[in-house]
Amino acid sequence: LVLSDKKFTTDLEKQWIRQKLLEYKVKKGDLKELVVRMDIIPTSIALAQAAKESGWGTSRFALEGNAIFGQWTWDGQGIAPLNRDGDKSHKILKFPILRASVKAYKNNLNTHKSYLKFREKRNQLREKGKNITGLALTETLKNYAQTGSEYTKILNQIIKQNRLSDFELVKLVNSVKQVELNS
C-alpha cells in the first residue's frame, strides 16, 4: 500500500481515505502514520492470542460473546468475569459475530497507545525489507496481559509448538469454488 506519492483525485478515493483516517484514529492528512497503522498483523500472533485468550475457543467469553481476544471494556457491551475482584468494573467485550471480534482486535493493536512498540517494530521490519513475523513481534505485546513478559513467552511457545509460523505467508482469497459431489 503506497499512499505517500499518490494524489487522491476522485471523490471515492477521498472518502476512502477519510474513512481510514477515522478508523485508524490518525490525525487528518497524516498518510505516513496511516500506512504504519494499516499494516498486517502476523497470522501466527493472531492465532496464538486467540488460542490463549479464548482457551482454544472453549472459554465462556468465546462461547457466549464471540470474544476470542479477551479485550476489556469499561463501558461497552461485555461479559463480567466470574472471578473479578469486587473493586473492579471491567468486562470482556462481547460481539455478535466472530468477525466483529477480529476487527476489534485489529483496531486495538493498530490504534491503542499500549501497542505503539508493536507498530514501531513492525514498521522497522517493513522498512528494512524483513519478514513481519509473529516471533519477531511477540515481545512488543507485554501490555496485552497483566502477566507482561510471561504472556509473551507463552505466545512464543504456542506459536512454536503448534507451528503457527507456517501460516505467515498464507493468503486468503475471496472466491467460491463449485465442487460436484458424486451421489
List each model region and its residues.
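Catalytic cores of secreted/periplasmic lytic hydrolases that degrade extracellular macromolecules
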Residues: 1-48, 52-183
